[in-house]
Amino acid sequence: MNGHYHRSNKGGGEWEFFNLPNTWQINYGKLVFNLQPFKFKHTGLFPEQAVNWDWFGEKIKNAKRPVKVLNLFAYTGGATLAAASAGASVTHVDASKGMVTWAKENAAASGLSDAPIRWLVDDCVKFVEREIRRGNKYDGIIMDPPSYGRGPKGEIWKIEEKIHPFIQLCTQILSDDPLLFLINSYTTGLQPAVLSYMLNTELVKKIGGKVEAEEIGLPVSSNGLVLPCGASGRWEK
């Protein structure tokens, strides 16, 4: 074990390290990610998302046409880089300037500095509302919404209240021939069955396609089990 995170009953916590550098890199295929630990437990990457990167990467490659992807609450850009490396043009939106800078550094480390990626520091809800007014459309939408957050101008996000209306909003910027819609959840109240219900209600009932929702996790080498890490809901034509 290289490090252990100790939670505090006052919120947050502290890392205890064992022969671990302050920063390091990790590779997934051709993608390179810069990692460092933070007091809120994150290290800059959710590796369990690799199963989703593989899924939508194949869909983008097999589309045999230009694909525009919108990545919302995009964090340090794992999904952005996976989509761009598969050939998509990507719009990356996150409310944190620091996270967008980190994502750009990951793109540079992955040799994707010149990839067609648009980097935006913005409130995701307000951005989608503006895209509706502009008439912009996307073939794929990916989102990894936090349980709670604030936009760059103090906008409050509470996932239990906001997520279903936000999915409804996002369906208005899907293209006439959409390819995929992915939503990830690390919130206890948004389990696979809930994600499936929302995607079936807002997408399948209106434009067809199919939905798959399941838990995602990381394999544990010491016991052969899978450590649950969250849930994903996928829609595809």
Predicted regions and their residues:
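Conserved SAM-binding loop of SAM-dependent methyltransferases across substrates and taxa
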Residues: T76-A88
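Mobile active-site "lid"/loop adjacent to the S-adenosyl-L-methionine
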Residues: K97-M99, V121-V125, Y138-L169
